[in-house]
């Protein structure tokens, strides 16, 4: 082996002569066929596996390599590390030896034991020419070594700029940047950008960014920003921020780059990096001052006092989007919270912007103007929406470094970087705070949050269809430049960009297919995607976009045809592509996504964005239509009064669908519809009637509009109307209505409840309610135009089971003055709060309406288990003052004290009659004119009715015919009743089981009592009264339930007689019931606790509360009949609470009440026979009474079980 070692030593020492001699001996030995001389092994390898060719390649001697190759040395011989001579030649970076080896057919992609090919070594050590030659000889730059690094990775890791440029210019650049040969799940996975950032190679990073590498690509350690921050590479951090890296991305250890700097570094460089990251992060940290949660809002952020919240963005409705990171649990929570519950704990250093509100009042969405930055203000009005990435332009001011901790330096907004999604890996959106105190218009295609524009009621804006507003529609300045709206996109865009010296980007916008309206909705990500990569330019263009004022251009209706929709968007050229792809209807187009657009062939970014904006508008309109249908939105629209569009609450995180203001409380919760209506209407503006809906659409669910609404007072709701009905009681839309009407907020849909307040109608206009009466809950009818013929306010009950004719009726007044008053009826009422009564009662006047609250919802009748009974007060307390002799009423009864909730409690105010035209068949829930002149009234309430919420109640009432043309002689007030019916019996505690029925029958049946004695106010009746109840119609009540009539009459008089007020005092007033009828002005209805009232000359009856037991009053539906209604005499009132121990006495009173009801029916029969109607009405009345007795007996049985 001596000669082989000599050869290796000679090659190693570069002794060409010695090598030549040894090689020559090898040649001579080959020529000799026989000889004792042993042949020289040219491929001999030492202990390390090195051969002579290895040493020659490593030394770079061309002569030695050539000699060895001539001597048949193996060109791809491997050493102990698997390295070949080409590896060493490439490592040395000498071009000619590499060329020589390559000509000798060296393997260019042969890998060593650690997986490296010669190109790895050439790239790692920056040998540009060698790398270029290897690439020319088909070396594969995508091969990875055992550390999962490509030649580009090594070049970037070691800062080999020229080699990196060479590799980036190769045809496999995209594969290198994407890392196709790498597994992202590998723990050693890395990218060239990470390696360059870790080692601080700024120029290499610039080349990588220029080549289009994903700046936010993440590895186990995070993004490249994490690496640069951890290793203290300040300039690299600044460069990455300029490139638009997302500073809020967390690594697998749930750390941001700023967290890493705070935890692991303390150098001067780290302090600078902290400064840069704080400026770039867009972070405003606040601390919660108190607990806040909203279980009904899935988008709400539930916080506890002391929680530190990172503010991400500002929602247009005034709420802030925050993020809470719980380090102990390793969880993150993102949601919206009102800014009034937090205080600022850290402020970003940067450009001073608007201060945070110090008062606990959230930002309201009623700002109808977009903030316009000053000419020298470097802070752009970045729109909310997709959370832009942060970048800092080198030529843009970085803010005042001395303003750390100052109140105004809340931070600066950075422009966005690449067009990739800024969604964090933890599933929560990250981004920056929109720090202006005013909501900014959405420029993101992802935002479906209309309603930024909130006109005040005085704006008198015309009504627009649902979801007709788009964010930021009305701005403070006119369109700039003017031709933006004229479709000359190229010239308009060029002129616009020329205003801030960036006209060089005109081609970028045009090539991407953007026109001016779509530019107005661009985000910083969109700007990056079209090639605006310079952060300073991107920031400037974004700020100018935010100042654009472009009128609404998206169609605010759902077109029938796809082509029509595309033409409205200005993209009819895609009709064929959409149809051929199967999107041939509007329903299918509404579900388009970005990915599907690319598959279809819509490749221009501007066209994609415009189509997606149109798709979002379709979704908004569809949601708006569904919302309108759910609330009974009809087609009829009124033109009176101001129009408001209400935004829907963020129920599931989606933006609602209707535009307009949302009036908020100090914690950002929505005000009730009534307060919105009152605040929007200024307290005096009459609101128009909303369109009606059918009873099948009326349900409790229509009232359940999200959180916090269960105790709200509803907005007035008119009854179902059909303008085409021949005998409607509605004025045409264009005619003036005789009284002011109520309306819910436009766009919100009609509220499912009606509250019309009967009242006195003097010749002078009715004054408004005093401050004690809540305006939002009480609407007054207007005074009549002609004093002699005051119109009556329209009212109707809420029928739960409505006949067909009622479907076609319209709400409103009859044409011309209507004189006959409506008969009162029984209805569900609820007890108002004591505070409401105390506020209302002392200042009530005869012309004041009553505060109203919601009753039960309309619903189709259905059978079911009884709902839970309402809570009741044990009794009624209150007093009434007798009405004055001139017909005006005193203060209302029952308004000064608590009262029990009532079901059937009519009020007895009267109105002076006026001429009225006969009407056709009306709904059984509407009161027809009657000669007694008793207007309708509704009970009202201040608390929830559980059984009303269940929607199981059913009122069965018969249609009542209209009376004859009224006479000019009015009558004193009389009482008539329509009692509601329930298909279930509400149970009460045993000691009070019979009290509800007894008090209900007191209201109904005492009108006919003929018990003798001076204490009976009914003993003096009109001469035309029919015979006594001895000749009553067939009665099917069980004797076991109803005691004898005499006993019941006497007990009834003892219970119902008011002590100290003898009955005959009511005689003079009652004697006029059918004789001369003096003019009596209308008495206003009682306050929410509507009590029965007997007007008389010398009586002061006590209030009676009618309990919540439903009575059946059901009978055949009648055709309209002529003739005056009988005048039921007034009844005395109960003096005080009813003791629970008088159960037997209540049963007796029940009997007398039934007897009185029969007498009232007989009086009605007598009156009708005398006035000329046929006997059919008599038969129907008796049938009604009989049917009512049947249901009443069943209920009595059930109650006594």
Curated annotation (Swiss-Prot):
Residue span, SH3 domain: 281-347
Residues found modified as Phosphotyrosine: 253
Biased composition (Polar residues): 415-425, 837-856, 1012-1038
The protein's name: Caskin-2
Main location: cytoplasm
Any one Pfam family match given in the protein's UniProt record, by short name: Caskin-tail
Residue(s) carrying Phosphoserine: 358, 371, 393, 396, 403, 406, 409, 471, 724, 855, 874-875
Repeat region (ANK), residues: 48-77, 81-110, 114-143, 147-176, 188-217, 220-249
Cytoplasm as UniProt keyword: yes
Keyword entries, A-Z: ANK repeat, Cytoplasm, Phosphoprotein, Repeat, SH3 domain
GO cellular component: cytoplasm
InterPro entries: ANKS1/Caskin, Ankyrin_rpt, Ankyrin_rpt-contain_sf, Caskin1-CID, Caskin1/2_SAM_1, Caskin1/2_SAM_2, Caskin2_SH3, Caskin_C
Organism: Mus musculus
Source domain of life: Eukaryota
Phosphothreonine found at: 880
Biased composition (Pro residues): 764-773, 961-973, 1123-1132
Record-annotated SAM domain positions: 488-551, 557-621
Composition-biased stretches (Low complexity): 904-921, 935-944, 1042-1069
